[in-house]
């Protein structure tokens, strides 16, 4: 069996920044450090940070007075931000991905101008909850759609004063279909100046598409609650190839590999490379040969941590 590795795969700049913020806060201020929601959607990362002194909570009320709080990479609503600022906290750091913040600013701008806004996204995802929570104009409207069917059923106040934006981790193909429906249903709707789906999501979907062309099966390293990891597995499955979303090498089932000559491996944007290396080692134990990395788009984007946290610390592998 041959192992093919997608390129690019794994950590994106927003995830790197978010994890670094938690690591550096622990290093500078000591444990415990409170984080609202999982800083990124990866079990290994969350467990590793817990071992170092991070405490993950869902409600601001769970944070004791005088503590240090960090918002996750997915962002928070205006209401959550205001609640945190009203508390007697020592420090408050925001690990929201800058590309998510860009979408937040689009929604806030629409709210100020009185435009109705439509968000393409998955209900219940923390990024969607945070983005929807940027809209506060009582005379306007903020709506969530997930599919073309949602668009056809949507009723708005003023079809001539509409804009749309998207969750950053969606399927490029699925989103395109929803945007087509929006443009047909509401001809005067205005979209973002630049695509809201982030570079890392787009690049990893392109890379896994190339990978699936050559692989018999594809293993996607990522947690079940990771939106971008799920989209990678779905893309492969739509191409007619089996794809399995796994948290770690221990999840691999030998029968998946029966008859496969070429096994593709990729990782979602919140999955660290150490998990990919463990998957490769497991596949070799099961008889696979050396791994070969495909060519792909080079990524050089770096997002800086807050200036208060710019110290050298040991990072998660």
UniProtKB/Swiss-Prot annotation:
It is an enzyme of class 1 (oxidoreductase). It catalyses: isopentenyl diphosphate + 2 oxidized [2Fe-2S]-[ferredoxin] + H2O = (2E)-4-hydroxy-3-methylbut-2-enyl diphosphate + 2 reduced [2Fe-2S]-[ferredoxin] + 2 H(+); dimethylallyl diphosphate + 2 oxidized [2Fe-2S]-[ferredoxin] + H2O = (2E)-4-hydroxy-3-methylbut-2-enyl diphosphate + 2 reduced [2Fe-2S]-[ferredoxin] + 2 H(+). Pathway: Isoprenoid biosynthesis; dimethylallyl diphosphate biosynthesis; dimethylallyl diphosphate from (2E)-4-hydroxy-3-methylbutenyl diphosphate: step 1/1; Isoprenoid biosynthesis; isopentenyl diphosphate biosynthesis via DXP pathway; isopentenyl diphosphate from 1-deoxy-D-xylulose 5-phosphate: step 6/6. It comes from the Bacteria. Isopentenyl diphosphate binds at residues 41, 74, 125, 226-228, 270. The keyword Zinc-finger does not apply. The active site is at residue 127. GO terms for biological process: dimethylallyl diphosphate biosynthetic process; isopentenyl diphosphate biosynthetic process, methylerythritol 4-phosphate pathway; terpenoid biosynthetic process. It holds the Pfam family LYTB. Binds 1 [4Fe-4S] cluster per subunit. CDD domains: lytB_ispH (cd13944). (2E)-4-hydroxy-3-methylbut-2-enyl diphosphate binds at residues 41, 74, 125, 168, 226-228, 270. Dimethylallyl diphosphate binds at residues 41, 74, 125, 226-228, 270. Homodimer. Belongs to the IspH family. NCBIfam families: ispH_lytB (TIGR00216), PRK01045.1-2 (NF002188), PRK01045.1-4 (NF002190). This is 4-hydroxy-3-methylbut-2-enyl diphosphate reductase. It comes from Yersinia pseudotuberculosis serotype O:3 (strain YPIII). The lineage of its organism: Bacteria, Pseudomonadati, Pseudomonadota, Gammaproteobacteria, Enterobacterales. The gene is ispH.
């Amino acid at each position: 069996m041959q192992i093919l590795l997608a390129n690019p795969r794994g950590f994106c700049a927003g995830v790197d920044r978010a994890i670094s913020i938690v690591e550096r806060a622990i290093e500078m201020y000591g444990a415990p450090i409170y984080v609202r929601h999982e800083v990124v959607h990866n079990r290994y990362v969350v467990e590793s940070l817990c071992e170092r002194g991070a405490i993950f909570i869902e409600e601001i009320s769970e944070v004791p007075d005088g503590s240090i709080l960090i918002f996750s990479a997915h962002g928070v609503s205006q209401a959550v931000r205001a609640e945190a600022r009203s508390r007697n906290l020592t420090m408050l750091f925001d690990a929201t991905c800058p590309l998510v913040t860009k979408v937040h600013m689009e929604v806030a701008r629409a709210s100020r101008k009185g435009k109705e806004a439509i968000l393409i996204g998955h209900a219940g995802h923390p990024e969607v909850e945070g983005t929807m929570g940027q809209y506060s104009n009582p005379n306007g409207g903020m709506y969530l759609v997930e599919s073309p069917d949602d668009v056809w059923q949507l009723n708005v106040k003023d079809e001539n004063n509409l804009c749309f934006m998207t969750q950053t981790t969606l399927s490029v193909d699925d989103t395109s279909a929803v945007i087509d429906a929006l443009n047909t249903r509401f001809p005067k709707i205005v979209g973002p100046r630049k695509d809201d789906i982030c570079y890392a999501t787009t690049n990893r979907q392109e890379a896994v598409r190339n990978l699936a062309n050559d692989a018999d099966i594809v293993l996607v390293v990522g947690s079940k609650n990771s939106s971008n990891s799920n989209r990678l597995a779905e893309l492969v499955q739509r191409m007619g190839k089996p794809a399995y979303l796994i948290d770690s090498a221990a999840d691999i089932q030998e029968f998946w590999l029966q008859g496969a000559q070429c096994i593709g491996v990729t990782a979602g944007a919140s999955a660290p490379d150490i998990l990919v290396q463990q998957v490769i080692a497991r596949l070799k134990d099961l008889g696979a040969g050396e791994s070969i990395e495909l060519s792909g788009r080079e990524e050089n984007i770096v997002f800086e941590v807050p200036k208060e946290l710019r110290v050298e610390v040991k990072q998660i592998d």
